[in-house]
């Protein structure tokens, strides 16, 4: 079984696509959820997803493709943008989103600025990563999710203790039924925690947890 966010080593009879992992990832997560429900006393309204890099891409896939987002109350997606045409919002998004990414991330670029040139000619809404793969502009994708969440307000500054570290800043958009979208960015690459706390996210985690607990499933 593959770890979320870690590439699998496939055999010659297997097919690996960079936009997904090796097995039935959604089915695997569903099985974990079933086991937790059966064996532990958990609050099913406080199930949250967190994924980094390709684990974050998987989060986009779950939010987009799985029935009702597999019941997750929120998705925390770190340094991840889906491949172009993937990860689009479902007809109804009954969950919150927290997205954190670096402006200088070349594997998962939020826009074309890192290229020091415009995006694809005639297609400013398409971003090319360092490997030549195409991705959407982050803010465009989040706007599409906001449309499906319903009655979202305009973005407002969302203060954190990390503000100003390499121009780190966050913005929040409140939506109907207690849902929200928070997006954060700063001038760092594919490993934001290296710059934000230097402790593999140990000091950032409470901020993420507070967001999750404040946005239960409704």
Regions found by a protein language model. Give the residues of each.
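Surface-exposed intrinsically disordered loops and tails
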Residues: 1-20, 115-131, 155-172, 177, ...
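Conserved alpha/beta-hydrolase "acid-adjacent" motif
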Residues: 106-118, 124-127, 133-137, 193
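Conserved hydrophobic ligand-interaction patch in extracellular adhesion modules
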Residues: 98-101, 108-110
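Extracytoplasmic/periplasmic, Sec-exported soluble proteins
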Residues: 17-28, 54, 129-137, 196-200
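Serine-hydrolase catalytic machinery in alpha/beta-hydrolase-like enzymes
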Residues: 1-48, 61, 197
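C-terminal catalytic histidine-bearing segment of alpha/beta-hydrolase fold enzymes
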Residues: 98-100, 132-218
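Primarily recognizes the serine-hydrolase "nucleophile elbow" in alpha/beta-hydrolase
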Residues: 35-95, 106
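Stable alpha-helical elements in mature extracytoplasmic
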Residues: 25-32, 55-59, 71-72, 137-141, ...
